[in-house]
Amino acid sequence: MVAAGPQPPHPGQGESPPLRELRGVAERITYSNPETGYAVLRLSPERRDGEARAAQAQADDRLVTVVGTLGDVSPGEAIEARGWWKNDPKYGWQFLAIDYRTTLPATVQGMKKYLGSGLVKGVGPVNAGRIVDAFGEETFDVIDQSPGRLIEVPGIGPVRAARIAATWTEQRHVREVMAALQSHGISTSLAARIYKRFGDESATVIAREPYRLAREVWGIGFKTADKIARAIGIAPDAPERLQAGVLHALAGAADAGNTLLPEPELVAQSCALLEVAPDGLRGAVDALLDSGDVIAAPLPPGPPGPPPTSSGTAPLRDREPGRLIALAPFARAEAGLAARLRALAGATGAGERQTAAARIFSAVDWSVAFGWLAQRHNLRLAPEQEAAVRAALTAPVSLLTGGPGTGKTYALKGVLTLARAKGLRCVLAAPTGRAAKRMEEATSLPAATLHRLLELRPGGKAGRDRQNPLPADLVVVDETSMLDALLANQLVKAVPQGAHLLLVGDPDQLPSVGAGDVLADLLRVAQSGGPSLHPSAPFPVTRLQHIFRQGAGSGIALNARRINAGEMPRFGGPIQDCFFLPAETPAEAAQTVVDLVARRLPSRFGFRPGEIQVLSPMHRGEAGVGALNALLQERLNPARPGLPELRGAGRTYRPGDRVLQLKNDYDLKVFNGDLGTVLGVDAEEGELRVALDDGREIRYPAASLYALTHAFSVSVHKAQGAEFPAVVIPLLTSHAALLGR
């Protein structure tokens, strides 16, 4: 093994630099980018070639810098890296790692650092020192083979010893997965996720079905899985590779919001990804049709229609260019959504087919009802709001839409007040915890996230469905612009026949993050032409247009309307709540954002920094989400003596940090888009204690931190459905592609 030693001369121009090996313990992480995996770390190199141990004892004085795609290497982890030395004009000598693998450290200091890094649950820095002091270089052998001896260490009882042993065993399995993935650039956290998904079958899946990694493990893309597949000998034109490429192209379309693709476009995208001729791709599509992984439907003569029904359109074997291809879950979800909405909307007329609310309100004198709302509850509704109330209580399915400040919540209060006065069971929900909490505050009634309401479980299973529907006569869902096809289908399946469904939302907001622009599609189907009800709509739509909230003096409301109408926003003059500050460069814009949050807005308006949310259109760049989070954390919540920290997935968390959940975690019952604040760090257990904005408190184990990120700055899409006292948004020329209406 080549230790660091004196750095070799940098190879001259045109020469291939000699590959070297470097082994040591990561002492600290100087920089890391979780999105790209690029990191800069300081390494204490090991000498394992018989040289005196005294040289190793001086390692603190001869740390070396390692740069490269290092995933989420944590302080204390031992790594073996291959690469070469380079003399950077600005930063000096660095080891550029082209690949690496993590190993167990062999030195006493390395063992202490490793055990105390949070990788082993139940062991913090203090207990790590005690364990290694007790067992010395035999520490890992003791934990591995005689974990019962851990109770010999002061402060460690049987319960903690058992927890340490269990975590160590799991880490051993993860290291075995890492060994199978050596040279493929897979980080430790990804290996842990692979093991969590496949367990003892991980090595078999990697060796025989590597493309499953891309489909079933969050954070592993097709290119990584393809690299592994090619390394184990899967041919470029192998059927499994071609089919995996087609599925990846459809999954990419879903990430962009599309539930299906025309076949020619699908083939073209797959060819570009796989670098193969289109002939083989057509066979791959047919094979996926036969297996049921995808579903085909003919392209209608007009605009694309819905996918086939859940019973399935027979796979088309002709080569008509208009064939549409969808991943089976999306095709079935859209078909199921359409069929269930038709069934719910069909509960009209009289008798048993009529809903409970319709039976009650069909004979109501609405002038009396609205007068009662005004006199008894001080709810004085505008005519368009009255139309929304009538629709919600007489039609089985109705939509209520409008921009910010147009009185949607006020109209909803009228609906709920009348419904509850007649004894109807009302259930309220929204897609995110923050939106549900805001709904609850506005209506003074309980509201839940859709995930909790529907009792969603891993794999898309739901506790509430046609066989176990919601106990409700009226189901109200706010922020429906955030509904994707899969979630909307689960929702309508849980609405009992005979209940009313009221969908509330702003069609001018961004579409859902997931595939399927449900609200926009429903509005197109309803063919609503204005604020009043369209007589031919299959379900009534009320669009509120008059602004009631944030009145004439509000620059926010006025500029929102101007932008929506394609007009330039106006700043200055009497407008005192909407400002524009110019910046020459992205770096200057980023510094202006930080100064606004940390100093200027608190000083002028009295906002606390925690009440100010930074939104960025893009993740990358000097004024992107990632860079702004780093700058804002350093300014608002920097490292300081006595403040505990926990590192995970390339990020460092401290009490007071704002955080955001990136994907659904059914074990912790936290979901994509949930926002919160770190309350505390338990270094011994390797846990974060987070207070979510919806009032719940969650303990995050270190293994779950890969799905958490900082939220001093978030993307505009992630903030959908939320409201904040103050918002700062950098808008740069580099964001131009994302700044359309």
Predicted regions and their residues:
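Accessory, non-ATPase domains that flank or precede helicase/AAA+ motor cores in DNA-metabolism machines
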Residues: 2-304, 309-365
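Conserved nucleotide-binding/hydrolysis modules and their immediate coupling elements
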Residues: 20-29, 34-88, 96-100, 271-274, ...
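Residue-level signature of catalytic and energy-coupling elements of molecular machines
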Residues: 24, 124, 157, 221, ...
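Short glycine-/polar-rich loops that comprise or flank the Walker A/P-loop
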Residues: 76-81, 423-424, 472, 497-500, ...
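ASCE P-loop NTPase helicase motor core
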Residues: 260, 386-389, 395-572
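Conserved pre-motif I regulatory segment
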Residues: 365-397
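Conserved helicase motor core of P-loop NTPases
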Residues: 499, 507-668, 679
